[in-house]
């Protein structure tokens, strides 16, 4: 997910994207805790995507 693509989305779309990412992060964390997660790098990628979405939301709130 690119930050430039996120900047083109509306605030409502960003909020729904953030909600989806948070749900995905929760599911991945549960899989990691139970030892079912094979690709642990996805957890890091989702965490960074959440940070990107939050950054763009903050930028839009300030502008």
UniProtKB/Swiss-Prot annotation:
This is Large ribosomal subunit protein uL29. Signal peptide: none annotated. Keywords: Ribonucleoprotein, Ribosomal protein. GO terms for cellular component: cytosolic large ribosomal subunit. One of its GO terms (biological process) is translation. The keyword Ribosomal protein applies. The gene is rpmC. The keyword Ribosomal protein applies. Belongs to the universal ribosomal protein uL29 family. It comes from Vibrio cholerae serotype O1 (strain ATCC 39315 / El Tor Inaba N16961). NCBIfam families: L29. GO terms for molecular function: structural constituent of ribosome. SUPFAM superfamilies: Ribosomal protein L29 (L29p) (SSF46561).
